[in-house]
C-alpha cells in the first residue's frame, strides 16, 4: 500500500475486534512510525506505551467507553510539555503528528483503530490519569490518547469527506 492509499483508506473504527493478537513486531513498527514524526524544534515531546498483556488489558478495558474494549492491543500516547520556539509549547502538534503516523501505519498493516482522546484528557472523567496509574507512567507525562489496534470484526464504515472545492483552494485572495 502506498502512503497515499493508506491516507485514503484510513478510517476511524469503533466496532468489535477479532481476538487475533497483534504481533510485537507490528506493534514496534507502529510505535516507530509515531516516534519518527516531526516535533517542534526537535524536542521529541511524544512517548508511546503499547499494552498487549492480557492482565493489564483486563484492568484497563473497564475504563474505556466502548471503543477499543475488545482490541487485542492498546497504544497509549504520552505528552511531555516542553517549551520550544520562543518559549512556546508545541506538544499538541507533536503528538498529533505521531498519532497520524501511527494511524496510517496501522492501516497499512491491515489493522483498524480510532483516535480516542476526548475522555482521556477530560478532567471530569479522569480516565487518562487512571490508566496512567495502572501503567505506572511517570507524572512528567500526560496520557493524551488511546489507539486500539486489531483486526476489525465488522465492516469499516467510511464517512464521506466534504468535496475538495469546499475545503481547499489555490491562491485564495488573488
Which residues fall in each region the model found?
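Acidic, surface-exposed loops and disordered segments
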Residues: 1-174
Amino acid at each position: 500500500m502506498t502512503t497515499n492509499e493508506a491516507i485514503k483508506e484510513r478510517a476511524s473504527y469503533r466496532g468489535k475486534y477479532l481476538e487475533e493478537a497483534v504481533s510485537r513486531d507490528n506493534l514496534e513498527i507502529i510505535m516507530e512510525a509515531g516516534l519518527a514524526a516531526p516535533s517542534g524544534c526537535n524536542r521529541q515531546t511524544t512517548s508511546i506505551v503499547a499494552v498487549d498483556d492480557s492482565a493489564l488489558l483486563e484492568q484497563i478495558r473497564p475504563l474505556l467507553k466502548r471503543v477499543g474494549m475488545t482490541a487485542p492491543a492498546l497504544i497509549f500516547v504520552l505528552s511531555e510539555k516542553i517549551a520550544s520556539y520562543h518559549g512556546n509549547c508545541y506538544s499538541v502538534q507533536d503528538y498529533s503528528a505521531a498519532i497520524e503516523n501511527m494511524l496510517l501505519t496501522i492501516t497499512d498493516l491491515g489493522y483498524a483503530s480510532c483516535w480516542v482522546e476526548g475522555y482521556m484528557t477530560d478532567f471530569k472523567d479522569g480516565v487518562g490519569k487512571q490508566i496512567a496509574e495502572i501503567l505506572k507512567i511517570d507524572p512528567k507525562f500526560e496520557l493524551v490518547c488511546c489507539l486500539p489496534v486489531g483486526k476489525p470484526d465488522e465492516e469499516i464504515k467510511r464517512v464521506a469527506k466534504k468535496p475538495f472545492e469546499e475545503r481547499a483552494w489555490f491562491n485564495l485572495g488573488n
